[in-house]
Amino acid sequence: MTTRLLPAQVQEPVTFRDVAVSFSQDEWLHLDPAQRTLYREVMLENYSNLVSLGILFSKPKVIAQLEQAEDFPMVESGMFQGVYLGWKSLFEPIVSKEENKKVLKNQRVDKFFNFILGKTCVNEEQLEEQPGNKKNPFSEMLLSVRRGCRQERGFPGVGLVRNPGIKLPFRRKPGVAAGGGKPHLQQYSVLFKQLGFNRARQLCKCNICGKVFFHSSSLSKHQRTHTGEKLYKCQGCRKAFSQRSSLAQHLRVHTGEKPYLCSDCGKAFSFTTSLIGHQRMHTGERPYECKECGKTFKGSSSLHNHQRIHTGEKPYKCNECGRAFSQCSSLIQHHRIHTGEKPYECSQCGKAFTSISRLSRHHRVHTGEKPFHCNVCGKVFSYHSALTIHQRTHTGEKPYACKECGKAFSQSSALTQHQRIHTGEKPYKCAECGKAFSWLSRLNIHHRIHTGEKPYHCKECGKAFSSHSAVNTHRKIHTGEKPYKCSDCEKAFNQSSALIQHQRIHTGEKPFNCKVCGKAFRQSSSLMTHMRIHTGERPYRCEACGKAFSQSSSLANHQKTHY
């Protein structure tokens, strides 16, 4: 059964954390098979006790496994806490039910089960004082074992509670005294005798953090956590580890070995920690809670990563550009921007991506899947981000504001493009003529000047244009539509740019200045024509006589002399 080491005079409850035995993984590997069966025996003994009381419950899956196997599923972790946490999580829900509490109370063993679940402290006086307790097999067992343990020498002032058929699985944690007293490193359970630990042996203490070990070899291994020394290297990827057992686990990454199987769905894992985390998907258990926002997680690593949202910590820094990230996986994905690596390839079209999430999103192009629905208009989208942006057309939300002029946008990309008006940045350059543009769409339209491509046709007259906006402007000639009206003189225009130029007549504004002579103009085209006076450029040539002119209007006037 379960044990408790506690000075006899102390009556306060002590939790399992105070009395747990823990071994390093390497220490666990030194135990013989008979000693390892301690896990199995503790679990099965407590199960049998509940069954003997007549409490009805279906046999847990783990019990059926333990009845058939000698090894407890968590032996690789090397932690005896696994025994307790295993059977506590198994039995506590059973004995905590109201109907079962009554059975336990009627059988006068409620105190016993409260004790083994770490809820109360049990001593001989408490057991003796209850009428009829001596006839109870559980209480009688506790009393006889306590008396028997007193006869064992070398453990003065220490009370033990033990099932005679079970070796003692728990002891008081080294260096922790009950009741807040000084550390008592000499208080050991009989378990340590059985495992070959001598009470008089000198313990090995780390002079950096104070942690205590039974073997000098274990202390040496532990100290590598302080020095950063990593003696064990993987021949496959050269990754190094401080312990041989850690290297052995890592090698499964290369071999593909997955010895830990989920009994619910059959999925296999390389590490016990991965299996335990996975099993929480089936149970729904999320034991790790964020103290800031209350959000819960299946694994401690997920909680740790989440907490960086609150702290703002970004420990993973890119050596190329200095950008920092809160998660290692984000840094790895970011690195691919610099290396150009795209390891995730679409089996349908061969297109490659930097992350598996982007490949998953891309797959929807082929499947046509659009799982994100707008609850206002019913429109569907392939991506959640696209739905979010779309919903702003209904709400009118424009969360991205320009700090220069205050103009707001519904998309961050639109704000980024807009800011180039203020910065003058033109990152998109034409490979043909070197002309630069602020927006990629403008560069694509410009390319059509070189290719001659005019994909947009007027349905009225068939005239072709290089851009969609150009054909829309042209159509207003056929419709007579002039939606842009001057507020000063009521003159109307079919283009907004024509109205802006016209309004400069009223305002007198001449924003285009000649850098040579300082002369100002209302239109950029007028400035370009004027600049030819200084450069001597004459691009308009008469085909009849070869004479050249700086303006097309001058050429037109000259050509009249030939007719």
Curated annotation (Swiss-Prot):
Zinc finger (C2H2-type): 204-226, 232-254, 260-282, 288-310, 316-338, 344-366, 372-394, 400-422, 428-450, 456-478, 484-506, 512-534, 540-562
Name of the featured protein: Zinc finger protein 879
UniProt similarity note: Belongs to the krueppel C2H2-type zinc-finger protein family.
InterPro entries, sorted: KRAB, KRAB_dom_sf, Znf_C2H2_sf, Znf_C2H2_type
Function text: May be involved in transcriptional regulation.
Subcellular location: Nucleus
Phosphoprotein among keywords: no
The organism's place on the tree of life at top rank: Eukaryota
UniProt cross-references to PANTHER family, sorted A to Z: TRANSCRIPTIONAL REPRESSOR PROTEIN YY, ZINC FINGER PROTEIN 143
Native organism taxonomy: Eukaryota, Metazoa, Chordata, Craniata, Vertebrata
Entry keyword set: DNA-binding, Metal-binding, Nucleus, Repeat, Transcription, Transcription regulation, Zinc, Zinc-finger
KRAB domain ranges (all copies): 14-85
CDD domains, per the entry: KRAB_A-box
Cross-referenced SMART domains: KRAB (SM00349), ZnF_C2H2 (SM00355)
Organism this protein belongs to: Mus musculus
